[in-house]
Amino acid sequence: MQFVDEANIRVEAGRGGNGVASFRREKYIPFGGPNGGDGGDGGSIYLIADRNINTLIDFRYTRDYKAQNGQAGMGQQKTGRAGQDLIIPVPEGTIVRDLDTQEMIGDLVEHGQKLLVAQGGRHGLGNVHFKSSTNRTPRQCTPGEPGDERNLGLELSVLADVGLLGMPNAGKSSLITAVSAARPKVANYPFTTLYPNLGVVRVSPESSFVIADIPGLIEGASEGAGLGVQFLKHLSRTGLLLHVVDIAPMDGVDPVESVHVIEKELEKYSDALAGKERWLVLNKTDLLLEEEASELCDQIVERLNWTGPVFAISAVNRVGTDDLVKEVAYGLEQNRLKAQEESVEE
């Protein structure tokens, strides 16, 4: 299935039903009073987060959504039937904006969360409401009001605890394959990953986290080069970034320089993303002798002046990946506890 993370749609809520003007007409009561009923309210439109949907592709083919109109009122003070609400499922992590005002309407992050995006029109009033001591036979009634109309922008930002960063062919897909049940395409050429992959990492029966792999970044990504820029937003919700580095690239690119390239792209994209906690994962140690790999990893860390956590692994052979997973799970738990403490203090 194609991965689509942006879509524009138009929504129109139902119009309220008209009120009606009518009068009692019964045997022996030729001139009864008003008994015109109200119309029904127009149907509203809601978006609802659904964990079973993971792309916005359906909105590429259906862009216009309209809820049901309310029915007109009837005699004998019968109210018209209300229009049925329209409920549209979207993936968890969908941000909704009004395209005309650029206002963010909502952020649907939990399964079952509903968001009203177009309010149905209010019903019209029947003539029974206009009877008074001076007007015993009112003929006025009111029409139903139109429902809201909106042009909406939907933007999907995947929900993951951990995001993988790296140049194309750094081994990110191999890493997510090694630590989770996800099976992205893995090959020895750049841009094997064309859209975000999510994997659930189970540390124990009681502990797990979600990891996201996005297409590799290249220099100029923040200006649109390569594939990664359109997916950088998917890292915005993560609590931790794992920066995967190929320590022995076949094209001879300096691993330290590749780290600097991505750091610059993160800074250009947003300060928030550049400031996220980031761990260094030095991958493909299996391509060198153990002593050579260890020495090269030390050199990379020293040249980067890296002071954060560092892990040397071979994702293909799953060497060092268990320790990485355990440390990530522990780090995420510590971050959660810290956030809880800060919220209590506030």
Curated annotation (Swiss-Prot):
Localisation per UniProt entry: Cytoplasm
Region of interest (Disordered), residue spans: 127-149
Residues holding Mg(2+): S173, T193
Subunit structure: Monomer.
UniProt record similarity statement: Belongs to the TRAFAC class OBG-HflX-like GTPase superfamily. OBG GTPase family.
Its job: An essential GTPase which binds GTP, GDP and possibly (p)ppGpp with moderate affinity, with high nucleotide exchange rates and a fairly low GTP hydrolysis rate. Plays a role in control of the cell cycle, stress response, ribosome biogenesis and in those bacteria that undergo differentiation, in morphogenesis control.
Name listed for the protein in its UniProt record: GTPase Obg
Organism: Hydrogenovibrio crunogenus (strain DSM 25203 / XCL-2) (Thiomicrospira crunogena)
Gene: obg
